[in-house]
Amino acid sequence: MQEVKAFNEKRAEIYWWFSSLFAKELSEKELETYHSVEIRSFLAGLGENESLKPAVDSLVDALNRLQDRNDAQLELAADFCELFLKTDKYGALPYASMYIGESGLLNDKPAEEMEKLMADFGVQVDENLKEPADHLAVELDFLGNMIIRSNELEQEKHMEEAFVKQNDFIQNQLMSWLPKFAEKCKQFDEFGFYLSVAQLLIAFCKLDSAYLLGE
């Protein structure tokens, strides 16, 4: 059980890391850490899994190209703004409602469902994420909290039940729209940093789902 809980902590940290990338632009200082040995080792570790390797390689390639980009932080911040903060017509808005909602507008049914899930779990999401509940960063932050909450359980059968709920969340709240989101990133993210992050997130969700199902 202790091994499972230790692995849960790693899983939660990875989802929180993804959440941070979709929550806001990277600062100059944050971007510098992506060229550090620590982050590169973390990415290399993820890339040791064959199912994650292509997306990790794309992300590392984008990071390497960033080092040759003039005003890299400003350019990447502009990419973030163009992709995630402007219009659905020319970007990839990171809200589930834009992909699986009925109206094609923000704050549709997916946002309501997320609000209910959060209330039912009694899980607080990072208060700095001032976004509708179906924003990708909010959903990933919530999933990390779900995983950590399960570490309070002591019986194996209860952990198995928690795994079922986590997998349901991945399938229903994330994989139901992430592929469409990634397609939009592919269409509009010319440099490819955020596209590679989206592709890595999808690959990780698939891998994590297989783990939760015991495959």
From Swiss-Prot:
Record-linked Pfam families: Nitrate_red_del (PF02613)
Signal sequence, start to end: none
Family matches, as InterPro entries: Chaperone_TorD, DMSO/NO3_reduct_chaperone, HscB_C_sf, TorD-like_sf, TorD/DmsD_chaperones
GO biological process, one term: protein complex oligomerization
Main location: cytoplasm
Keywords of this entry: Chaperone, Cytoplasm
Disulfide bonds: none
GO cellular component: cytoplasm
Location of this chain's protein in the cell: Cytoplasm
Family recorded in the similarity comment: Belongs to the TorD/DmsD family. TorD subfamily.
Function of the molecule: Involved in the biogenesis of TorA. Acts on TorA before the insertion of the molybdenum cofactor and, as a result, probably favors a conformation of the apoenzyme that is competent for acquiring the cofactor.
Matches recorded under HAMAP family: TorD (MF_01150)
Name recorded for this polypeptide: Chaperone protein TorD
Organism: Vibrio parahaemolyticus serotype O3:K6 (strain RIMD 2210633)
